[in-house]
């Protein structure tokens, strides 16, 4: 059985995470304001964010104790899938890509719920992730609606 991770998040994560929503909200507003590049910039930022979410799992797998090595394939697979979906979202038509990014960001949070239940992620991280993921997905959908 995996050991439970410390559930305390570093203070910077509690500030920098919400700050990461500023570009999402600004770019979604830019789409509605008619800024020509805003939708593409929103998709690019969403893809970058989604790839980052996957990278979290690579970091966890690299520092996991040997007793947790059985989770390596699961963690590393979860680390790769968001980047692949982000890339796909950028080569699809913008209207499809924005929707895919919103779903993938929420989907990654859903999978992380399972990881948290298995003790692979701290519970406080998951709470913050759902708040941030929901807000990011809402901004992506708002941008999509503004096309």
Which residues fall in each region the model found?
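N-terminal membrane topogenic signal
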Residues: 3-19
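Short, well-structured hydrophobic secondary-structure segments
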Residues: 35-66
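C-terminal ends of transmembrane helices
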Residues: 3-6, 54-67, 110-123
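Non-cytosolic membrane-interface motifs at loop->transmembrane helix junctions
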Residues: 39-43, 70-74, 122-128
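Transmembrane helix-loop junctions and nearby membrane-interface residues
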Residues: 28-35, 58-61, 65, 87-94, ...
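Small-residue-rich segments of transmembrane alpha-helices in multi-pass membrane proteins
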Residues: 19-27, 75-87, 128-144
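A generic hydrophobic-segment detector
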Residues: 106-147
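Transmembrane helix-loop-helix
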Residues: 88-107
